[in-house]
């Protein structure tokens, strides 16, 4: 997702449809 946000990258891949 975003290189500056490593956490967001994993979060986006797991709960993409929720948000």
UniProtKB/Swiss-Prot annotation:
UniProt keywords, alphabetically: Antibiotic, Antimicrobial, Apoptosis, Cytolysis, Disulfide bond, Flavoprotein, FMN, Glycoprotein, Hemolysis, Hemorrhagic toxin, Hemostasis impairing toxin, Oxidoreductase, Secreted, Toxin
Gene Ontology MF terms: FMN binding; L-amino-acid oxidase activity; L-phenylalaine oxidase activity; protein homodimerization activity; toxin activity
GO cellular component: extracellular region
Group of enzyme by EC: oxidoreductase
Subcellular location: Secreted
An annotated GO BP: apoptotic process
Subunit structure of this chain's protein: Homodimer; non-covalently linked.
Protein's name in the database: L-amino-acid oxidase
Protein's organism: Agkistrodon contortrix laticinctus (Broad-banded copperhead)
